[in-house]
Curated annotation (Swiss-Prot):
<feature type="modified residue" description="Phosphoserine">
    <location>
        <position position="249"/>
    </location>
</feature>
<protein>
    <recommendedName>
        <fullName>Transcription initiation factor IIA large subunit</fullName>
    </recommendedName>
</protein>
<dbReference type="GO" id="GO:0005634">
    <property type="term" value="C:nucleus"/>
</dbReference>
<keyword id="KW-0804">Transcription</keyword>
<feature type="compositionally biased region" description="Polar residues">
    <location>
        <begin position="113"/>
        <end position="210"/>
    </location>
</feature>
<comment type="similarity">
    <text>Belongs to the TFIIA subunit 1 family.</text>
</comment>
<comment type="subunit">
    <text>TFIIA is a heterodimer of the large subunit and the small subunit gamma.</text>
</comment>
<dbReference type="GO" id="GO:0016251">
    <property type="term" value="F:RNA polymerase II general transcription initiation factor activity"/>
</dbReference>
<feature type="compositionally biased region" description="Polar residues">
    <location>
        <begin position="218"/>
        <end position="233"/>
    </location>
</feature>
<dbReference type="GO" id="GO:0005829">
    <property type="term" value="C:cytosol"/>
</dbReference>
<keyword id="KW-0597">Phosphoprotein</keyword>
<dbReference type="Pfam" id="PF03153">
    <property type="entry name" value="TFIIA"/>
</dbReference>
<dbReference type="GO" id="GO:0006367">
    <property type="term" value="P:transcription initiation at RNA polymerase II promoter"/>
</dbReference>
<dbReference type="GO" id="GO:0005672">
    <property type="term" value="C:transcription factor TFIIA complex"/>
</dbReference>
<dbReference type="GO" id="GO:0006366">
    <property type="term" value="P:transcription by RNA polymerase II"/>
</dbReference>
<comment type="function">
    <text>TFIIA is a component of the transcription machinery of RNA polymerase II and plays an important role in transcriptional activation. TFIIA in a complex with tbp mediates transcriptional activity.</text>
</comment>
<feature type="region of interest" description="Disordered">
    <location>
        <begin position="113"/>
        <end position="248"/>
    </location>
</feature>
Length: 369
């Protein structure tokens, strides 16, 4: 048997089938491109099986080591190149070699003329306006010496912060996205409790901000209808008054009452759905699940083919099934005696261990168990 000629044989078989099928395709009005597509699909599936080496499969192009192609002194060694190698002139290896030679020539030229005078990158000079920078002392807030060595910070007065035009007295809260115009006066201001400013969503107690009494009146006017509605006691659910739910003792008692009510409802449902058995003293026999009656048994046909011993396929010594090896061939002669068979095969192909082999003539002996 041989595996080297399997790819060529498959190639001739494919060409023969395509040539004989072309006339049928033309008679049925099928385009020739469809036939070529079927041929390519057939060939790609054969390559995926990896049963042999096929001639239409693209052969990998060999790589050339740089050490054999390039000499640092003499340059490219043309004697080591293979003339039959495909696409050597346009390969990326030669492009890299040319780049390496260019870098080496630049280094040699730099060493001959001196490294210091060969190339000096221009030093960027600062503009004249950038060197003459004047600082205004009035723009920097004065820092007061602190005996505790803490980080001082400039204080700002309440008049230096301006609210946006759309900020009214009803909404004195400043968001993080609001802007405030800060003017530096260059003078020290003592921190005042009435002029504490913040930008984190706090109130600015300015002279234009509403007083606490006014806010209290607004809140009381808004909550008056809610207080009038709370006068009516609620008796139709588990949601209680907010004042009663606020204390931990009331919350625990309400939760315990709700749990007891839920348990009682579940018990009532289970009690109604329970069916008492009063038809006898034996309880287990009737409650057991019976097998379906219409299920056919294994020996319903009463045939020898249903024997469970015959279902197990014989295995080889390696533990694999015999069906893994496939033989497709012609036979010349067959002799059998009882359960022993002797055959003579010719012009066949056998598939073993993922590879296909061709043979011209073979003898086989079989014993049926």
């Amino acid at each position: 048997m041989s595996n080297s000629i399997v790819g060529e044989v498959y190639h001739h078989v494919i060409l023969d089938v395509i040539a004989n099928s072309r006339s049928d395709f033309e008679e049925n009005g099928v385009d020739d491109a469809t036939l070529r597509e079927l041929q390519n699909l057939w060939q790609s599936k054969l390559v995926a099986t990896d049963v042999a080496t096929f001639p239409w499969a693209q052969a990998p192009v060999g790589t050339f080591p740089i050490g054999q192609l390039f000499d640092p002194v003499s340059g490219l060694r043309t004697d080591s190149l293979d003339v039959t190698a495909p696409a050597v002139a346009n390969s990326p290896i030669l492009n890299n070699i040319a780049a390496i030679r260019a870098v080496q020539q630049m280094d040699t030229f730099a060493q001959q003329h001196g490294n210091s005078n060969y190339y000096s990158p221009p030093t960027p000079s600062l503009p004249q306006s950038a060197t003459n920078i004047s600082f205004d002392s009035s723009a920097i807030p004065n820092v007061q010496s602190n005996p505790n060595n803490t980080a001082p910070f400039p204080s700002y007065s309440s008049n230096s912060l301006q609210l946006p035009t759309n900020q009214t007295a009803d909404s004195p809260i400043i968001n993080d996205h609001s802007t405030a115009n800060v003017t530096s006066t260059g003078q020290e201001h003592a921190p005042d409790s009435s002029s504490t400013n913040s930008f984190g969503g706090l109130l600015l107690p300015n002279q234009n901000s509403p007083k606490k009494s006014e806010l209290g009146e607004t809140e009381s006017s808004n909550t008056t209808p809610a207080n009038s509605r709370n006068d009516v006691p609620q008796t139709d659910g588990a949601i209680h008054d907010l004042d009663d739910a606020g204390s931990p003792s009331n919350f625990e008692s309400n939760r315990f009452a709700i749990a007891q009510k839920a348990d009682a409802e579940i018990y009532e449902v289970l009690k109604k759905n329970r069916i008492l058995q009063i038809d006898g003293t034996i309880e287990d026999n009737e409650d057991e699940k019976k097998p379906p009656v219409d299920t056919p048994s294994d020996e319903a046909i009463n045939s020898d083919l249903d024997d469970p011993d015959s279902d197990e396929a014989p295995e080889t010594e390696e533990g694999s099934d015999i069906g893994q090896a496939i033989v497709l061939c012609l036979y010349d002669k067959v002799n059998h005696h009882k359960n022993k068979w002797k055959c003579v095969f010719r012009d066949g192909v056998v598939g073993v261990n993922g590879k296909d082999y061709l043979f011209f003539k073979a003898n086989g002996e079989f014993e049926w168990i």
